[in-house]
């Protein structure tokens, strides 16, 4: 099993940090389906220090166990990241993850995320500052490099390891690729061979077969599931079962999916409040219903609703119609 410092994961399948997706309630749900580790949404370190309400909400920490309390920080100022890391440790975080992989323009233009891969000197200072600031393990998530000419993830991983970083996750694309093309899992093997700390493969892990292929091609210690978990929080358990037994575990029945969707919907509304919760829940309802009969009509109807009870009734009506078709 994977060990991050003194923390041992129960599974080698990790839920990726995803802005606007991996909030407290989604992490809680996916953890229940067997994720070895769940990571918060990316939080801007400077915003964390000034304690913006949004940043504090993003880092809401699950106290169930250490593998539920991993917070991802972004930023380019070593002292600011260090202070934010210490703040999160004081709030109960058990692992700090550093974002060196986000390709979004607004993040890169602030010289954060994957832009940091272009400055190995600054990267080293950030690693060292974060590790020195806290007693808990610090990890990093990166890409292969900035572009095809600068695939420096193996070098950066070595720098990270020397600085005290305890785990490296690599998305198998460059920043310039964004999410186009296919993730290069074979390249991640170069990172695995460069360091002794755990290496996690990320990118295009959308089903159990791809998870197995990614592990085989990368020789990584585990996989990180991102967009593949949209509307399928149970994917983690399917992958885990397949890797352990070689058997394909079916998705939950539609009846069970209805229970999961209703539970998640209610948790969102309870956590954010009705006015904010309903709009946030809409995207999840869209992902959950994708591929089911008449899902477009369902999504269209839900997107026009603001009353939480009406949305809940619509969810039940939609899934009941799917069940009756079977």
Curated annotation (Swiss-Prot):
PROSITE patterns: UPF0034. Its EC number is 1.3.1.-. GO terms for molecular function: flavin adenine dinucleotide binding; tRNA binding; tRNA dihydrouridine synthase activity. InterPro entries: Aldolase_TIM, DUS-like_FMN-bd, DUS_fam, DusB-like, tRNA-dHydroUridine_Synthase_C, tRNA_hU_synthase_CS. The keyword NAD does not apply. The active site is at 102 (proton donor). Its cofactor is FMN. It comes from the Bacteria. It catalyses: a 5,6-dihydrouridine in tRNA + NAD(+) = a uridine in tRNA + NADH + H(+); a 5,6-dihydrouridine in tRNA + NADP(+) = a uridine in tRNA + NADPH + H(+). The keyword NADP applies. Keywords: Flavoprotein, FMN, NADP, Oxidoreductase, RNA-binding, tRNA processing, tRNA-binding. FMN binds at residues 17-19, 72, 141, 202-204, 226-227. Pfam families: Dus (PF01207). Coiled coil: none annotated. Belongs to the Dus family. Catalyzes the synthesis of 5,6-dihydrouridine (D), a modified base found in the D-loop of most tRNAs, via the reduction of the C5-C6 double bond in target uridines. This is Probable tRNA-dihydrouridine synthase. The lineage of its organism: Bacteria, Pseudomonadati, Pseudomonadota, Alphaproteobacteria, Rickettsiales.
